[in-house]
Structure formats: C-alpha cells, structure tokens
C-alpha cells in the first residue's frame, strides 16, 4: 500500500510548512500544491545555495519527484515565469517534473492594475 502525507497549515502565515515539505519531499514521488497564491515564499538551502520558492513545490529539487500545481492555486504568470527562470539559472532542471492544472485561476498584470485603480478611487 502506498502512503501519503498531507501537510495543512491553519495559521495563514509562516508556520514552517516549506521546510517540512522540503524535508519529506525526497521520500515521495510527488509533491502537490493545492491552493493559495504566490506567497511570501519559503527559503530552502540546497548545497549551501539559497532558494526562495513562492509557487513551485519544493520537491522540484529531486529528480524522482513530480511537482503539481493544483486547480486551487491562483497562478501569477509573471511570478511563475520569474521563479522558473531563477531555478534554471541555478541549474535546477524542471523539464518533465512540473505539472500545472489547466483549471488554475490566473492572476494577470491587469488584475494588479484594477486593484491599484480601485484603491485610488476608494482612498483618495
């Protein structure tokens, strides 16, 4: 029988989830992020190099681990592309290891502009 480990944070903040997932991810075949957005990030050190992940699951550092971004994630395309570029520049291979649900809600630059305009109208 295959075993699963589910880590759920209930404090809406820095609870150390990223460090726990990183610790266990090398023992699993898959690491899934099921909800949330491009958060403040969790810091991971691999071979004394610092990585800060916001969207991509920390299992990405292990060749045998498939990483999934699920449909409950609010996906910032700009943040995702920036994170992928930073990982690739540091020699992390993502090819064939990262899967993204086609049902993710997209957070586009237009949404940030709308929020800025709304704030200007409400608070000026």
Where are these regions (language model features)?
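Extreme N-terminal starter segment of soluble prokaryotic enzymes
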Residues: 2-5
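N-terminal basic/disordered segments at the start of proteins
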Residues: 8-46, 59
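Glycine-rich, N-terminal phosphate-binding loop and its surrounding beta-alpha-beta segment
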Residues: 41-116
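Catalytic core of tubulin tyrosine ligase-like
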Residues: 120
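Conserved small/polar residues in nucleotide/adenosyl-binding loops
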Residues: 123-124
């Amino acid at each position: 029988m295959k075993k699963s480990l589910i880590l759920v944070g209930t404090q809406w903040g820095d609870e150390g989830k990223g460090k726990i997932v990183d610790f266990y991810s090398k023992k699993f075949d898959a690491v899934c992020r099921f909800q949330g957005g491009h958060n403040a990030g969790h810091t991971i050190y691999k071979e004394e190099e610092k990585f800060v992940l916001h969207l991509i699951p920390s299992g990405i550092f292990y060749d045998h681990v498939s990483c999934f971004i699920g449909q409950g994630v609010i996906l910032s395309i700009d943040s995702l592309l920036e994170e992928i570029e930073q990982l690739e520049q540091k020699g992390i291979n993502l090819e064939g290891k990262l899967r993204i649900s086609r049902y993710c809600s997209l957070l586009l630059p237009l949404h940030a502009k709308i929020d800025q305009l709304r704030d200007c109208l409400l608070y000026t």
